[in-house]
Amino acid sequence: MMGCQTFSYDDERRLPLYLLNNMLGGPGMNARLNLSLRERHGLVYTVESAMASYSDTGCWSVYFGCDHHDVKRCMRLVLHELDRMMQHPLSERQLATAKRQLKGQIAIACDNREQYALDFAKNFLHYGRERDINVLLTRIDAITAQQIQDVAQQMFAPDRMQTLIL
């Protein structure tokens, strides 16, 4: 597992990081880390990234399962993908695809009544009101490639990363 401290629930950079996280290791088979570590190199059984935001801080992590002799190579490949996100801005097409995928996942999550209830409670606790899904979708549409790159540069510097190997 690799990860770093990240943004609080109220931080404006949280949503661009959420989109970036989804691109890197979200649930889709087209997530960058899945394509690199599993499909291209055949090194992992599973790979995913996750983020959690709290009132005062947050955390972001990458988890992968591999043979013990492949750990260092997998870590190098993860760092390579993070470096790509820091160094190369997304094309308009890549950004549009990522936004469309995330908005689709949100729409599907809204159909899950348990998830909807959890989201409702979380937003009520943090903001005292229900989250307006249309506002969220509009905010996702407003994310720029520059914001994604800025967040990647802020979050993924090698000196910020912590590792845990079991």
Where are these regions (language model features)?
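His/Glu-based metal-binding/catalytic segments typifying zinc-dependent metallopeptidases
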Residues: M1-A31
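M16 family metallopeptidases and their MPP-like homologs
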Residues: M1-F7, N34, R38-Q87, E92-I143, ...
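Short, conserved catalytic/metal-binding micro-motifs enriched in Asp/Glu and His
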Residues: Y18, I148, T163
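A short, acidic, amphipathic alpha-helical segment used as a generic capping/interface helix at domain edges
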Residues: T144-D150
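Short proline/glycine-enriched turn/loop segments at secondary-structure junctions
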Residues: V151-M155
